[in-house]
């Protein structure tokens, strides 16, 4: 059994940036004297021109969020150039390959500077200009961080697409971003499998006629088709350019990147983050949440295709002059000891991973952990979804041997950085709780009707005021931004998560309240999975819900109604799984498919997902009121044939 409360270790508190007294004082000031507080925090970066006004925010329609108005800076300069005098020979990126026998790579800040300048000059030569959107579909190699920083250097907006996404998902994102330039690799590796990146791009580009140039990084050495006039090899182009490139002065509110995330309506949303506020927030949260100090070796095991990789592998750590480890592999290849072997090999001090990875390694037993030393570790972090207390305790007691605080961080693609988290030297930890808000963050709990809940209680989690890392809009669709985040509870940012607050004021995230499933820390819209299923010619209708999954947190449970005359079969089930994998990617593979002759609907024809959720969760005793259904008998039929018992 785990304890309910893990007090702050006094040794940790002594060395930490923030102790309990400082947290309370700084938090109080960040709320009471908000603008002065955020003006001070912005001094951590180098500005070409200081801002005229700290913030201008309205959470009421028309929604507008602006920070550091009139300020000018360059993100690439702040992550690379400004470290050259004092940290030029320090390792910036430490790369560990998928295959443990592949030599690791160290790239110093001096080397990173030259690589970023060269890459930026190749982009310019291709015709990329300030404000252009560039799609990046790359393996987890240092060139990916270089490509992102090169875009930031010349003022281009990057749109990184996770390398596990299918050609259809890539083309959707290219079209939505009106993107004319793509950067990819020949192929990548993941758990010994080859990921055919260039081949996927070629398939995606059939639907995207506006793409003019594709820059291909030679990495895996696979044979790929190169289309003359469109496709360019990076290793050939880079020979023709200079290794110096002046950083473009950018307005604080100029876009830095777009990152697509799942929405409840199906079409992925282009979450847009801007330059100044985003970097202030990524840098500050990286320093204080992970208690980062100059000699730390920091490793976030996420993929750069997700926001965690943007904020806490690339931008936050590099803005702080850190050594950031870039890992190509997976937790269990070639053995379940891999994470801890990498920790020992590179003397990692701070380690940040997902509950899914922790649960999958916990299932393998303690022996795989205990064959390694891990003595350099001093802090552990968790991100992507709520961590169950048992996994938290195993992470703390077995991996961290009871000496490493665990920062269980809650945040979202939309928030740019961590919003609710323990600070290791200041806040006692409760397994499973995200604990308390970060500086300047004002969480509130509301009833479904929008009434604020004071003290302990459970409700919908909203945030009452802006913070610099907040997204500014949905790319080219501000109306959708307002509708999704600001219309349910006017005057607040709606997170889409449910939350409980205990008697100590600690926050416990209870999961999504909208139609989004959190699978292995990755958000998937149920609507996009349903659309993929219904795209099969034998399917009439589909409804997808999440259900508790021991490893992934949530699994995907699909109820499928076939067209009349069609017959369910194991063969068809496999076909449907392949359809979803092709349309969205392997991450969206349904775990369970139940054949449903009919779906429970209200008299107005709306599918009652609440009921389907209870059936999928194996709680047929908690169905609640079914009298509003047009055919109540449907429910018993589904209960009798449920897959998850």
UniProtKB/Swiss-Prot annotation:
UniProt KW keywords: Acetylation, ATP-binding, Ligase, Magnesium, Metal-binding, Nucleotide-binding
The catalytic activity, as recorded, is: acetate + ATP + CoA = acetyl-CoA + AMP + diphosphate
Gene Ontology terms for molecular function: acetate-CoA ligase activity; AMP binding; ATP binding; metal ion binding
**Name recorded for this polypeptide:** Acetyl-coenzyme A synthetase
N6-acetyllysine PTM positions = 606
Record-level GO cellular component terms? cytosol
Q: Which InterPro entries match?
A: Ac_CoA_lig, ACAS_N, AMP-bd_C, AMP-bd_C_sf, AMP-binding_CS, AMP-dep_synth/lig_dom, ANL_N_sf
**Residues that, per the record, bind Mg(2+):** 534, 536, 539
Q: Which PROSITE patterns does the UniProt record give? A: AMP_BINDING
Q: What does this protein do?
A: Catalyzes the conversion of acetate into acetyl-CoA (AcCoA), an essential intermediate at the junction of anabolic and catabolic pathways. AcsA undergoes a two-step reaction. In the first half reaction, AcsA combines acetate with ATP to form acetyl-adenylate (AcAMP) intermediate. In the second half reaction, it can then transfer the acetyl group from AcAMP to the sulfhydryl group of CoA, forming the product AcCoA.
Classify the source by domain of life: Bacteria
Family named by the database record: Belongs to the ATP-dependent AMP-binding enzyme family.
UniProt-annotated binding residues for ATP: 384-386, 408-413, 497, 512, 523
């Amino acid at each position: 059994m785990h304890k309910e409360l893990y007090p702050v270790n006094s040794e940790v508190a002594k060395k930490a940036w923030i102790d309990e007294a400082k947290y309370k004082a700084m938090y109080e000031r960040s709320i009471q004297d908000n603008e002065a507080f955020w003006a001070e925090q912005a001094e951590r970066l180098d500005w070409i021109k200081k801002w005229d006004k700290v913030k201008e925010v309205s959470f009421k329609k028309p929604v507008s969020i602006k920070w550091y108005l009139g300020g000018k800076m360059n993100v690439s300069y702040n992550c690379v150039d400004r470290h050259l005098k004092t940290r030029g020979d320090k390792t910036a990126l430490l790369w560990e390959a998928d295959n443990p026998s592949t030599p690791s790579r160290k790239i110093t800040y001096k080397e990173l500077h030259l690589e970023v300048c060269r890459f930026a000059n190749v982009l310019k030569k291709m015709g990329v200009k300030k404000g252009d959107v560039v799609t990046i579909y790359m393996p987890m190699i240092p060139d990916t961080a270089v490509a992102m920083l090169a875009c930031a250097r010349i003022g281009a907006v990057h749109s990184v697409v996770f390398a596990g996404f299918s050609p259809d998902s890539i083309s959707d994102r290219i079209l939505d971003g009106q993107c004319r330039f793509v950067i990819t690799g020949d192929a990548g590796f993941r758990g010994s499998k080859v990921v055919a990146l260039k081949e996927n791009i070629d398939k995606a580009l059939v639907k995207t006629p506006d793409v003019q140039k594709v820059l291909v990084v030679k990495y895996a050495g696979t044979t790929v088709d190169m289309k003359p006039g469109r496709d360019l090899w990076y290793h050939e182009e880079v020979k023709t350019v200079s290794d110096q490139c002046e950083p473009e002065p950018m307005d604080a509110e100029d876009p830095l990147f777009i990152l697509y995330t799942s929405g409840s309506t199906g079409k992925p949303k282009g979450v847009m983050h801007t330059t100044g506020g985003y970097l202030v927030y990524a840098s500050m949260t990286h320093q204080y949440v992970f208690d980062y100090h100059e000699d730390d070796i920091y490793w976030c095991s996420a993929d750069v295709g997700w926001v965690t990789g943007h904020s806490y592998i690339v931008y936050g750590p590099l803005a702080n002059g850190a050594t950031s480890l870039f890992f190509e592999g997976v937790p269990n290849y070639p053995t379940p000891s891999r994470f801890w072997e990498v920790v020992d090999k590179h003397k990692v001090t701070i380690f940040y991973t997902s509950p899914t990875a922790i649960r999958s390694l916990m299932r393998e037993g303690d022996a795989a952990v205990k064959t390694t030393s891990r003595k350099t570790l001093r802090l552990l972090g968790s991100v992507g979804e709520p961590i169950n207390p048992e996994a938290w305790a195993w992470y703390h007691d077995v991996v961290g041997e009871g000496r490493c605080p665990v920062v269980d961080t809650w945040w979202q693609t939309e928030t740019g950085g961590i919003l609710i988290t323990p600070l290791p030297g200041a806040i006692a930890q409760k397994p499973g709780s995200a604990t308390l808000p970060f500086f300047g963050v004002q969480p509130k709990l509301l009833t479904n009707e929008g009434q604020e809940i004071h003290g302990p209680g459970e409700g919908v989690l909203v945030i009452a005021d802006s913070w610099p890392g907040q997204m500014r809009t949905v790319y080219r669709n501000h109306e959708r931004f307002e509708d999704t985040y600001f219309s349910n509870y006017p005057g607040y940012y709606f997170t889409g998560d449910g939350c409980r607050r205990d008697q100590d004021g600690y926050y416990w995230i209870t999961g999504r309240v909208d139609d989004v499933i959190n699978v292995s820390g990755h958000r998937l819209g149920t609507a996009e999975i349903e659309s993929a299923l219904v795209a099969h010619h034998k399917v009439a209708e589909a409804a997808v819900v999440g259900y508790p999954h021991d490893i992934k947190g949530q699994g995907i449970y699909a109820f499928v109604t076939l067209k009349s005359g069609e017959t369910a079969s194991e063969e068809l089930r496999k076909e449907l799984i392949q359809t979803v994998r092709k349309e969205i990617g392997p991450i969206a593979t349904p775990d369970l498919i139940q054949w449903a002759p009919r779906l429970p609907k209200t008299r107005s024809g709306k599918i009652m997902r609440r009921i389907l959720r209870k059936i999928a969760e194996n709680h047929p005793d908690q169905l609640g009121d079914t009298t509003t259904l047009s055919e109540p008998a449907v429910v018993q039929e589904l209960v009798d044939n449920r897959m998850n018992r």
